[in-house]
From Swiss-Prot:
Keyword entries, A-Z: Amino-acid biosynthesis, Arginine biosynthesis, Cytoplasm, NADP, Oxidoreductase
Class of enzymatic activity (EC top level): oxidoreductase
InterPro entries reported in the protein's UniProt record: AGPR_AS, AGPR_type-1, NAD(P)-bd_dom_sf, NAGSA_dehydrogenase, Semialdehyde_DH_NAD-bd
Family classification: Belongs to the NAGSA dehydrogenase family. Type 1 subfamily.
Native source organism of the sequence: Rhodopirellula baltica (strain DSM 10527 / NCIMB 13988 / SH1)
Protein name (Swiss-Prot/TrEMBL): N-acetyl-gamma-glutamyl-phosphate reductase
Stored PANTHER family: N-ACETYL-GAMMA-GLUTAMYL-PHOSPHATE REDUCTASE, CHLOROPLASTIC-RELATED, N-ACETYL-GAMMA-GLUTAMYL-PHOSPHATE REDUCTASE, CHLOROPLASTIC-RELATED-RELATED
Active site residues per record: C154
Record EC number: 1.2.1.38
UniProt keyword Cytoplasm present: yes
Amino acid sequence: MSSSNLRVALVGSTGYTALEVARLLLTHPGADLVVATSRQDEGKPLSEIHPMLAGRCDVTLQPLDADVIAKSADVAMCCLPHGASAESVKQLAEAGMRVIDFSADFRLSSLETYQHWYGVKHPWPERIGDVVYGMPEFFADEIRSADIVANPGCYPTSAIMPLAPLVKAGLIETDDIIVDSKSGVSGAGRSPKLGTLYCETNESISAYAVGTHRHAPEIADLVERIAGAPIEVMFTPHLTPMDRGILSTIYVKPVGKAGSVEDAVRAMMSLLRDTYSDQPCVHVVDHLPATKYVAGTNHVQISVRPSGKRAVIVCAIDNLTKGASGAAVQNMNVMFGLPETAGLLM
């Protein structure tokens, strides 16, 4: 630990995303985990909650006190659930800290949309639509000066990355987009639930939250913000019997002027390559992406294929890394002028 390193506080430390943050910071050359909080496990070492950290991280869990944390850390990563997170983010920001929020509390641009989909009263409504969305590939300039960054959702990351450039360029129809996503079980969190028990998930794939998943409005909202055009998206998530990873298969219609579907796909691949040519974490590839190719990394793999009258986009990410904690470390690096990929397995 260097005295000149960035000091990181982890708020809400018992879940998988918190473990992933701690894991990534272990090898970060310019940042150290110095504070970790938990209401239920105060006084315990973080390594007791996450045995993977035994012998490598000796931080003791403490209660959340924003003023105390602000004296010890430069940035807070808030890994609390929606509703509870916004209140803690407010306290930390008012104590003078810069904050990266893992919840959905500040991702959407509309308070009405947030309250409709999440069913809670927002404790800091004046910041809705004001907080920067944490996708450096599109918002790096805003992230550099942000006091709060809304870390993207995992499914939305796998959909926004390929869709936003194509919508912005006018290469696909915007009123008929189908996003079919498969996720590992870690995406459901660490708290025990019937639906994520081994006997329920092993050797089974199941759709869930059909037509009601809260990431659908996030996908539509962010594509419109980036591309400047509204979209209609049908989003269906599935739970798969693997620990981590997301594979999104996205069905789109090329615009009528694009010529053949094959020509349209070539144009899409070319545009995506140009868009992400300088982005270290996003790769437009000729092979079909798979979750195994990006597991444990901050990489995104995207490819496009023709199929009948549609183009089929395939995008793979690790839901815990680029879909959560890796993106947070990437955002932290941008916020504090560190190399963008520092601490990330590249």
